[in-house]
């Protein structure tokens, strides 16, 4: 998936690119946006770019009736404050507690059909890391932040993830080409699965492009920062295969030549 910062996911739920098309059997960002835009309830608007001489106007399909008159090309300071106030509840992170972990879902939907079609109700590594960064910036949320990070660490330490790392370390060619994206370390899972299994489609792991080294790099970066600050201690390191998974992930990224490997 492209553009999965917490801000981008928020905006994706409000408006989407009107030129996106679904391609092939694999679910992509284009097909997700196409599903959202096909509802028929969107308001079609055109906006001036900041540099109209160089860049043309851009088009947005706005799905939120609440915000359709609030999205503008330019804002005053008071308008920005008003927008922050209007979206205050929307921007709050909702944590999902399970016996096997604490999760930040990419998004939630009122109807199961949209959730099933987009899979934004799954747990995404990158989105959860952005959520963790928001939580850890507030001392009052430090306990919840650590729970989220440890849950992601446990996901990266599952037997399936460790096997993917070991397989690529042994044979980096497993990542060559487009059809082998499922061989990469996975970056998304079903929070309802006690073993943090893949999102399922017709009883099988859904085909997805998991080649997202930027998410893996952010994960390692934040993990190291948590160690440096003492947030993560020796007891945390010693649980299960956490230490093993970190060592394997570093070797995996090296064997995958992450610096030249294209992200999805």
Curated annotation (Swiss-Prot):
Q: What is its main location?
A: membrane
Does the keyword Metal-binding belong to this entry?
no
- Annotated InterPro entries: 6-hairpin_glycosidase_sf (IPR008928), 6hp_glycosidase-like_sf (IPR012341)
Residues bearing a lipid moiety (S-diacylglycerol cysteine): 17
For this record, the Gene Ontology CC terms, alphabetical, are: plasma membrane
Which cell locations does it reside in?
Answer: Cell inner membrane
Residues carrying lipid (N-palmitoyl cysteine) = 17
Keyword Transferase (UniProt): no
Provide the GO biological process annotations: carbohydrate metabolic process
The signal peptide stretch is 1-16
Listed PROSITE patterns: PROKAR_LIPOPROTEIN
- Membrane topology recorded in Swiss-Prot or TrEMBL: Lipid-anchor
Q: Keywords assigned by UniProt?
A: Cell inner membrane, Cell membrane, Lipoprotein, Membrane, Palmitate, Signal
Question: What's the miscellaneous note?
Answer: May be missing up to 250 C-terminal residues compared to orthologs.
Please report the name of this protein according to its UniProt entry: Uncharacterized lipoprotein YgeQ
Q: Which organism is it from?
A: Escherichia coli (strain K12)
